[in-house]
């Protein structure tokens, strides 16, 4: 099985577009997203960008329901109150609600975790 590892997103929606193309082209059977969806340098006031990025992640989760999701330090920094570089207090509510929306869009809660095992690896 070929597994596509989607790297840290950090507000870059185009990464999901590229991942989608790779899967559609048959170069991967499934994906694992390393998340780190929020936060990027000098983007703390760009709340719409946060929304757009999470919405793209949610759309990807719906379109590719076997995708596994690994929380990154930037994702958990919001609910855990452990601020990371690039943390946006202005986007906090958005991140928290969109993260919950992403979790609820998955067919199983087991699809999102700190780590995953695929084929005993």
Stretches with model-predicted labels:
Residues 6, 13-118:
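Core catalytic region of metal-dependent phosphoesterases/phosphodiesterases
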